[in-house]
């Protein structure tokens, strides 16, 4: 089960989608419909996302958390009071980045533990170039 994203398939009618993961800031949540960045609004305490129009039937809808990796959300100052909320934010940022890394790795092509061959996990592989060497993978287009 993913901890940092949720995926839906558009039905041409639904505009509201549940956000089933936690996040620190709303800016850390993004939505794509068929891979195109899409704007949305959050309601119900940030657990429901609403799109302005319903994704088409069969469209791939993804809401994904991307916690800031380039900027620390907590800055500790020497001599300042150490607050629980600062510790929680700092810990949560690191925890969320770990979850996101694990989720991203779960979507990657992996080596099978049974035969040490690449395993696409029953997903299509797209955007493959035509082969140029004898042992390259051949695309359907190349073979037709």
Model-derived features: where do they sit?
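Right-handed beta-helix
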Residues: 120-132
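Polybasic "coupling" helices that flank or enter modular domains
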Residues: 107-116
């Amino acid at each position: 089960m993913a901890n940092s994203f949720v995926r839906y398939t558009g039905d041409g009618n639904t505009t509201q989608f549940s956000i089933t993961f936690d996040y620190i800031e709303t800016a850390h949540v993004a939505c794509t419909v068929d891979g195109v960045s899409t704007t949305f609004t959050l309601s119900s305490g940030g657990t429901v996302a609403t799109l302005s129009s319903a994704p088409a039937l069969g469209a791939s809808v993804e809401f994904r958390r991307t916690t800031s990796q380039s900027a620390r959300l907590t800055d500790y100052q020497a001599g300042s009071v150490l607050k629980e909320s600062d510790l929680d934010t700092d810990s949560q940022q690191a925890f969320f980045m770990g979850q996101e890394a694990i989720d991203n790795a779960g979507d990657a092509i992996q080596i099978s533990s049974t035969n040490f061959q690449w395993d696409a996990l029953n997903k299509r592989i797209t955007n493959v170039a035509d082969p140029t060497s004898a042992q390259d993978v051949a695309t359907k287009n190349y073979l037709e």
